[in-house]
Amino acid sequence: MSITRTAVSYYNLGYVEHAEADFREMLDHGCTTVILAVTEFDFDFWRPNIPRIVEAAHRLGLQVLIDPWGIGKFFGGEQVSKFLQDNTGNRQVSALTGEALPYACFNTPSFRDYFARFCLTLAREAGADGFFWDEPHYAFPKSYASITGGAGEDWTCRCPVCMGKFREHYGYEMPKVMNDDVKRFRRREALFILEDTSRRIKELDPAQEITCCVHATLNSYYVTEHRGYDDWDEVAASPYFDVFSTTIVAWNLPRGFFEEITRRTVAAARKYGKQSERWLMGYYRQPEDFAEIDRTVELYESLGVDRLGTWTYRGGYGTVLAAPDALKLWDRIGENYKRVIGKGK
């Protein structure tokens, strides 16, 4: 099997002529897909431009996906959330302290309506080829487990809406200490918002492609993050998702970690007849030896990955999260993209 799609994320939605020049550079770097990181501010302020930018990408032959980047801080991303600015309620609440946190509770009707309106409006207006669900997650007041640390005790969300739904379903008050019922409840509610919006998008246009990208964590006996999308079988099995994707792994992590995450990603996707996607870290950090990029892409190829993604265009050049050698990093990723896409033709 060959890698058939190579994607890169893109922030700059202000001017079509600038975007078109950037799209040409993406093509020169072997990209087949651009993921437009559409912020809540972009939606409110630059929305008339988005269809024109999509059209420019299509004219050049790029597939276009829309990422509601950082929306409500429910998705990954550094952008500021207008929903949180305008809503002092509808926030995720710490189970142990009762503190309202700067993350929208995606189980509330208010945020679900906001998210659906955002996505469905763009589905009607923008003319893109699909949507990219970008690292959806519950908040972690104490930074739940990662590959380098143990699990924290606190979790979300224990807001009045979540507590009411839990009580209605299970017949008792949602506990402050996470149990199996809480884990199941959180996963079910987390999946609902994405499935419901994906279903409605596909009702508008059945050809719309939906990628769901979840955190690349081991979820083993020792390390389980409980982000809400940790059961990869549940996510990959959804009839509303076309591509099962797992997120970036930092370059300094062991190669065995890359391999295990990739094997599990491909296995979950194949089990449910979905395309698999793995990512390259193209910002902030870079490998000590750029040959590690080549080796990682070769690993992805050898394990049967269908698609590659890179965050972000030009290595984040000009941003606070730029890689030290951002343009060189971007060029090396481009060399690998051109190589694998050449094989896929």
Language-model regions: role of each:
Residues A7-G14, I35-D44, T97-A116, P175-L191, ...:
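The substrate-binding groove and active-site-proximal loops of carbohydrate-active enzymes
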Residues A7-Y11, L65-W69, F132-P136, D181-G228, ...:
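Aromatic-lined carbohydrate-recognition surfaces of secreted/lumenal glycan-active proteins
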Residues Y11-L27, F111-L122, V223-S238, D289-L299:
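Short, acidic/polar
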Residues V16-F43, E125-A128, A237-F244, L299-L308:
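Catalytic domains of carbohydrate-active enzymes, especially glycoside hydrolases
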Residues D22-F23, I35-D86, F185-L204:
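Aromatic-lined substrate-binding rim segments of carbohydrate-active enzymes
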Residues I66-A126, F166-D180, E195, A291-I293:
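Active-site-adjacent "subsite" loops/lids of carbohydrate-active enzymes
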Residues P141, L194-F258, R285-L299:
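Substrate-binding cleft/loops of secretory-pathway carbohydrate-active enzymes
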Residues T246-P254, E277-G344:
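Substrate-binding cleft of secreted/luminal carbohydrate-active enzymes
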